[in-house]
């Protein structure tokens, strides 16, 4: 059965430059913050980093000197079985319930579970829909 919860993810938006990822990850390391999930996107003149961390307050404090903007985004975090078709089951369930998935990123290794982070049109409803996946 899936472990599904509402979490707050950090969106860090900053001017794009070579080394930004290094700057961000070093700042978080120096603050003692663990990164549970990350997504990073180059949007031309700016970069967007999505960070699910062990401590959002420390994350914000650590990123502030880097000159970007820190926002909090409520997301659904689901830890599900690592097997073929698991994401298809989730995607179909959400589609059938009329829920839009605006953003998704996931991590997978050879471990028995996968962590999926989703920004949707109704996080509360998603949590209820995925409890038995």
Question: What does each model-identified segment do?
Answer:
Residues 1-133:
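A conserved regulatory-domain signal marking ACT and ACT-like small-molecule sensing domains
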